[in-house]
Design a protein with these regions (language model features):
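Flexible, glycine-/basic-rich loop-and-beta segments that form/coincide
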Residues: 369-452
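Mobile active-site "lid"/loop adjacent to the S-adenosyl-L-methionine
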Residues: 240, 280-311
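Conserved SAM/SAH cofactor-binding pocket of Class I
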Residues: 186, 194-278
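Conserved catalytic loop of SAM-dependent methyltransferase domains
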Residues: 331-338, 364-380
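Long, charge-rich, low-complexity alpha-helical segments
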Residues: 49-103, 125, 129, 133-135, ...
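Acidic, low-complexity/disordered tracts enriched in E/D and polar residues
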Residues: 1-52, 91, 147-152, 157, ...
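Conserved Class I SAM-dependent methyltransferase catalytic core
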Residues: 238-239, 304-363
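SAM-dependent Rossmann-like transferase core, predominantly class I methyltransferases
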Residues: 93-112, 118-212, 217-225, 229
Length: 553
């Protein structure tokens, strides 16, 4: 029956391109924010199969069985029920769920207006119903609903992926969100494709590999992407419901994924992979909130504080092939006693100690406890909770952070590369970057950043400035020398980086002809500065600029 569903959605042209044609940019943007009403207004009265499916599965609106039969002629409404994707509802439930306004007249009935002397012909009163001929002792015949109302039990929507190996159009099933149900999320809720998911999808390295692992697979979208460039894909999740949805989505999209239930790396003990991706349930949640509001499996791994991230980082190397990569999103606590700008990395650094990996760690944002709690409690439909329950959960969360001495929570990502035996003997190398302004890194940016940690000897390297790098100079009026120099990156990470005049000179001369050592010697001679002093000034900034893609070798 899944094959029939697939055939029908393809035949109905229910694709992202069709959604672009059916909906305005504003309505599409609203859907990305989980706001369905603009789309429902624009699709009202549109009979196209794609419009029906969008209203039903994405907009959460009831539809008549006949409309679903027309949109899915092979599977039909009955097939949706058999698959567990939809259910029949009565007229009252449908009426309460429909959001489009009903026709309403505030004028008096025609007969009353005529009696009031408005010159209209009076209507005849309605005749009473005819008496029944049924025997009073006879059981009444059950009412037959010819065209019942149906409601979706899951979110199903098209998703397009443009990848190095080609373009793909998929259909992805997940649990309905609070915007569709009007209720807080259930403990076992399986998320669809949200903002964090898209971030990880975009930053994943898409090189062809033999094996890939998705830890905490949720609805399975990461695994679908991995299957386009990995010969073998394994997906794991502690949630049985998530595993079932991943299996369903794999079948719907004719993709082979080995789905296993279990926590983190337990289901793949003894196996290794060339690429591991994970958007783990990292939200720092106190036991008091779990007891009062339940444990939302999609965001809460059940561990104390931010120890889930430590568990992933410490367990990953045993499941990585030499040269293999891990990419993950993460949160970490920064104590109030530490400076969040200069000491944020200490906790992550401790987790990485002794591991046979190189690491690139980026903190993209920080939130104070109140903003962190507000974000995550709203994410699960908190405002739809009973007010007293909402406020108790909110305050319990804040009290927990206060007792733990948490100043802010860092949010970012970690990329690891597994070292071979020879590399591991000299220890792993790490780079910590704070707040990468500009563009979110793509897969090739991550791959380059990790590779740059093991680049050639700097002074003997011939560097080439990226073609999109430009320099901005700020002068005090009348001064011959610039007060501020900023390098701008048009592509790549899109960063803007203040630099010294010496760094600017080295970057400017890096045209693929001379080594860095030769350029430094020339800069030292031109500026009458000792070469060792120039080296000391430019070494760290040049390594950063290489990692960020301003310079290549």
């Amino acid at each position: 029956m899944i094959a029939r569903l697939r055939a029908d959605v393809i035949a109905s042209s229910w694709t992202t391109d069709t959604l672009d044609e059916l909906l305005s940019d504003g309505a599409l943007s609203a859907l990305m924010r989980d706001s369905r009403l603009p789309a429902l207004v624009e699709l009202a009265g549109v009979d196209a199969p794609a419009a029906t499916l969008t209203r039903f599965f994405i907009g959460g609106q009831p539809e008549r069985a006949s409309a679903l039969d027309a949109a899915l002629p092979t599977l039909g409404a009955a097939g949706l029920e058999t698959l567990g994707l939809a259910a029949t509802i009565d007229e009252d439930e449908a009426a309460s769920a429909l959001v489009m306004p009903r026709p309403c007249s505030k004028s008096a009935p025609k007969r009353e207006r005529a009696q009031a002397g408005e010159g209209e012909e009076a209507s005849f009163p309605t005749a009473p119903a005819l008496p029944t001929m049924r025997d009073p002792d006879e059981e009444p015949e059950p009412e037959v609903v010819v065209d019942p109302w149906m409601r979706a039990l899951y979110d199903l929507r098209p998703h397009a992926a443009a990848l190095p190996g080609g373009e793909h159009e998929w259909w992805v099933t997940s649990d309905l969100g609070e915007g569709q149900t009007g209720k807080p999320l259930a403990d076992h809720h399986v998320m669809g494709i949200g903002g964090a998911t898209r971030t990880l999808l975009e930053m994943t390295v898409r090189d062809q590999v033999d094996s890939a692992l998705d830890v905490g697979c949720g609805c399975g979208i990461q695994a679908l992407y991995l299957a386009t460039h990995a010969r073998r894909v394994v997906a794991t999740d502690v949630s049985a419901r998530a595993c079932a949805l991943t299996q369903f989505n794999a079948a719907l999209n004719e993709t082979t994924i080995d789905v296993r239930e279990g926590s983190l790396f337990e289901p793949v003990e003894g196996e290794t992979f060339d690429l591991i991706v994970t958007n783990p349930p990292f939200v720092i949640t106190p036991d008091t909130v779990r007891c009062a509001s339940g444990m939302h499996e999609y965001r809460d791994g059940g561990m104390d504080r931010d120890n889930l991230i430590a568990a992933v980082l410490r367990g990953a190397p045993d499941c990585m092939t030499p040269g293999g990569t891990l990419q993950m999103l993460a949160n970490w606590e920064i104590p109030a006693s530490r400076n969040p700008d200069t000491q944020w990395s200490q906790r992550v650094d401790e987790w990485l100690d002794g591991l046979p990996v190189d690491a690139w760690v980026v903190q993209r944002d920080v939130l104070d406890p109140a903003r962190y709690v507000d974000m995550w409690i709203r994410d699960s439909g908190g405002p739809l909770m009973v007010r007293a329950d909402y406020e108790r959960a909110y305050t319990s969360w804040l009290v927990d952070f206060r007792r733990a001495g948490t100043g802010v929570i860092g949010m970012g990502f970690v990329a690891l590369r597994r070292l071979d035996e020879a590399e591991a003997a000299s220890g792993g190398r790490r780079a910590f970057d704070l707040s990468l302004d500009g563009h979110a890194p793509r897969g090739h940016d991550v791959s380059w950043a990790l590779a740059s940690l093991r680049g050639p000897e700097l002074w003997d390297t011939v560097l080439t400035r990226a073609s999109d790098v430009r320099e901005e100079r700020h002068y005090v009026p009348g001064s011959p020398d610039p007060e501020l120099l900023i390098l701008h990156q048009g592509g790549g990470l899109g960063r803007s980086v203040p630099v010294s005049s010496a760094v600017s000179a080295v970057v400017g001369a890096s045209d693929g002809e001379l080594t860095v050592g030769q350029i430094v010697a020339a800069v030292a001679m031109l500026t009458s500065v000792e070469a060792d002093d120039v080296r000391a000034e430019v070494e760290a900034p040049l390594r950063d600029l290489i990692r960020w893609g301003f310079l290549t070798y």
